[in-house]
């Protein structure tokens, strides 16, 4: 529930450093917030790689370098100090992982209120193996982001879906059934093994008309070819 009888934050730190798809959904929630509260200053803590996702939004950035400057416990404390220097007065943790927990804990000790995303892991776990019968749709991540803001006292409607604009398909005319396969991750533990990925692509190719392997550059792009 939103906080009652509390002044709304004037400068909000929003934390989401990965994964790319989750960061890409954040601007939809921010746009809904800014439409209702244009006077609220927002600083997004993320990787510089993801800045283009927020084009057209009136937000600032606090870049986080998870592999260098802000690595480990000391890095998290350093990042919290940098955030505090911006005079933020609330934190919206849209990630809720070990690093963001350390950052928000350090800021909370400074008296800065925090709000954290509820990822719905129990609901997702309960759905496994049940099929589709009698199962209600899970709450969309964008709505979960909005709820984080609402728990800080903001009150605004859910974002409106963007209007679809016709664009030419760079992959050509769609014929048959296409499927995408994304075996890679920024974290090694979440990356599907190469041999199993190759076997998965082989099996998918026998069942679908086109298989798209989503990858980054370097070795990932080489595998995708």
Regions found by a protein language model. Give the residues of each.
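Catalytic machinery of carbohydrate-active enzymes
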Residues: 1-225
């Amino acid at each position: 529930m939103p906080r009652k009888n509390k002044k709304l934050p004037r400068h909000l730190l929003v934390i989401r450093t990965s994964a790319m798809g989750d960061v890409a959904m954040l601007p939809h929630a921010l746009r809904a917030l800014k439409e209702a509260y244009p006077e609220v200053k927002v600083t997004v803590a993320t990787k510089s790689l993801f800045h283009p996702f927020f084009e057209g939004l009136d937000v600032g950035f606090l870049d986080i370098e998870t592999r260098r400057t802000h690595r480990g416990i000391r890095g998290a404390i350093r990042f919290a100090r940098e955030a505090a220097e911006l005079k933020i007065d609330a934190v919206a943790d849209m990630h809720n992982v070990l690093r963001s927990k350390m950052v928000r804990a350090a800021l909370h000790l400074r008296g800065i209120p925090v709000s954290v995303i509820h990822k719905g892991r129990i609901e997702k776990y309960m759905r496994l193996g049940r099929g589709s019968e009698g199962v209600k749709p899970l709450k969309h991540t964008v709505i979960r982001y909005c709820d984080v803001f609402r728990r800080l006292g903001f009150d605004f409607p859910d974002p409106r879906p963007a209007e679809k604009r016709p664009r030419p398909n760079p992959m050509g005319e769609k014929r048959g059934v296409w499927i995408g396969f994304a075996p890679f991750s920024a974290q090694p533990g979440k990356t599907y093994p190469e041999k199993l990925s190759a076997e998965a692509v082989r099996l998918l190719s026998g069942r679908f008309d086109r298989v798209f392997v989503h990858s980054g550059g370097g070795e990932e792009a080489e595998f995708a070819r």
